[in-house]
From Swiss-Prot:
Catalysed conversion reaction: 1-O-(1,2-saturated-alkyl)-sn-glycerol + (6R)-L-erythro-5,6,7,8-tetrahydrobiopterin + O2 = a 1-(1-hydroxyalkyl)-sn-glycerol + (6R)-L-erythro-6,7-dihydrobiopterin + H2O
Name of the gene this protein is made from: Agmo
Location, primary (coarse class): endoplasmic reticulum
Keyword Transmembrane appears in the UniProt entry: yes
Protein name per its UniProtKB record: Alkylglycerol monooxygenase
Keyword Acetylation attributed: no
Organism annotation: Rattus norvegicus
Enzyme Commission number(s) from the entry: 1.14.16.5
Annotated motif Histidine box-3, positions: 221-225
Chain location of the short sequence motif Histidine box-1 per the record: 132-136
Compartment annotation: Endoplasmic reticulum membrane
Every Fatty acid hydroxylase domain range: 118-249
Cofactor(s) needed: Fe cation
Length: 447
């Protein structure tokens, strides 16, 4: 989306204000896409800071943290996975937009006009509303979007639980703008629209008074994430709630919201979170007789079945009682802290990889991606207490040391090199012993 140095032009103030769409047209006007900063990348430290702040504030106000460690790690893992394709190419939303602009535009609005800026703000938000609505009403698109709804908690980390597949359907809804709005203006607003939706994933903020009439707020979005019957298929807005009010999909928060999918998946494995509904569609597609019914499996709602309305029957949605207990890891507190530590190590190399894509070789980037994916998989296995978790973690630590020795992974602080080697050597020994125990007992063969 931008040249490697573009993000350095974003000040701390701009990085924070971008998260609330509080930017002036004059400070976000760029002639080319290459000049547009990566505002999402710049916001990463703010994400982490605000997640920690929310935990503290929730503890003070409610006497308990706003989320559970296992769920927060799973949400952040999804966020990491969703951005890995950006190491190789622009998002499909921007790439397709540029193609249509260069080949089919009918007119060219001035890139530095405030009127263009505000029109694009409305256009992107309108496009997002319809994408988001279709993501709930078309099963094959829901297969991607459901990952975002899989958390049974509702906090700022939930905003990071993004789908790696979502951009492959969302791009269609922004194409009309490419007929007249310059790509550089679109590239700014597609990021701001996403960033705005971060802070509304919280229970700490209850209501915002008159702003509730116009803006999408935490209260409105809590309804959207609910699995109560009154919450289903409501409040699709990105920034402005007016679209829901206009098109009849608005619902006010009026009773306790129970979060998550109507049928919780009960896992912390990041790739199962991402792809489990695709597997469900695959098996349902082949088990459903008739071409028309197979077509409907893909393009009608997730609740559709033969003889049912397009979006399914509301009475088939499980009733909530308010006594639902979220799926929680049975792992020890020590193991959860270990998972956090390993996630933090991975995150350092993840951020460093994005910051240095221009100088790293393709081989190094690919190997780092393998390490990142294996780390997230292993953390999911550990939290789910899978029998194979010890074996996977042993292999992961061995991979780290191998990549480290060959120079594909290096700590930012050179003096920590020896400490890294010692730490991962101890991990290999610990998990290696547990792996041998599992292999000897045969427990690793269990699902």
């Amino acid at each position: 989306m931008r040249n490697p140095g573009a993000q350095d032009n974003v000040s701390v103030s701009q990085g924070m204000r971008a998260m609330f769409y509080m930017m002036k047209p004059s400070e976000t006007a760029f002639q080319t896409v290459e000049e547009v900063p990566d505002y999402v990348k710049k916001a990463t430290p703010f994400f982490i800071f605000l997640i920690l702040l929310e935990l503290v504030v929730s503890w003070i106000l409610k006497g308990k943290p706003s989320g559970r460690l296992d769920d927060i790690l799973t949400s952040m893992s999804a966020g990491v996975v969703s951005r890995l394709p950006n190491l190789f190419f622009r998002s499909l939303e921007v790439t397709s937009y540029i193609y249509i602009w260069e080949n089919y535009r009918v007119c060219e609005l001035p890139w530095d006009s405030p009127w263009t800026w505000y029109l694009t703000f409305l256009g992107v938000d309108f496009g997002y509303y319809w994408f988001h609505r279709m993501a709930h009403e078309i099963n094959i698109i829901w297969a991607a979007h459901q990952a975002h709804h899989s958390s049974e908690d509702y906090n700022l980390s939930t905003a990071l639980r993004q789908s790696v597949l979502q951009q492959y359907s969302s791009w269609v809804f922004y194409c009309p703008l490419a007929l007249f709005v310059p790509p550089s203006v679109f590239a700014v607003h597609i990021q701001f629209n996403l960033l705005y939706q971060f802070w509304i994933h919280t229970e700490v903020i209850r209501t915002l008074g008159p702003l509730e009439l116009v803006l999408n707020t935490p209260s409105h979005h809590r309804v959207h994430h609910g699995r109560n019957r009154y919450c289903i298929d409501k409040n699709y807005a990105g920034t402005l709630i007016i679209w829901d009010r206009i098109f009849g999909t608005f619902e006010a928060e009026n009773e306790q919201v129970i979060y998550g999918l109507t049928h919780p998946i009960g896992t912390f494995e990041p790739f199962k979170v991402q792809f489990h509904h695709l597997l469900y569609i695959w098996t349902t597609f082949w088990a459903t007789p008739g071409f028309c019914h197979k077509f409907s499996v893909l393009f009608k709602g997730p609740g559709w079945g033969p003889g049912k309305p397009r979006l399914g029957l509301s009475e088939e949605i499980p009733e909530v009682t308010g006594q639902e207990v979220p799926f929680t890891s049975s792992a020890s507190q020590f193991l959860k802290i270990y998972a956090v530590l390993q996630f933090a190590v991975m995150l350092v190399f993840y951020e460093e990889t994005f910051a240095n894509t221009a100088v790293l070789s393709q081989v190094t980037i690919l190997l780092r991606i393998c390490f990142i994916i294996l780390t997230l998989t292993s953390i999911g296995f550990l939290l789910d207490q899978r029998p194979k978790a010890a074996i996977v973690e042993t292999l992961r630590c061995l991979l780290f040391l191998t990549l480290y020795r060959f120079g594909h992974l290096k700590p930012l602080i050179e003096s920590l090199s020896f400490a890294f080697e010692i730490f991962f050597s101890v991990c290999i020994a610990f998990w290696g012993v547990r792996s041998i125990t599992h292999l000897a007992s045969g427990s690793w063969k269990k699902p």
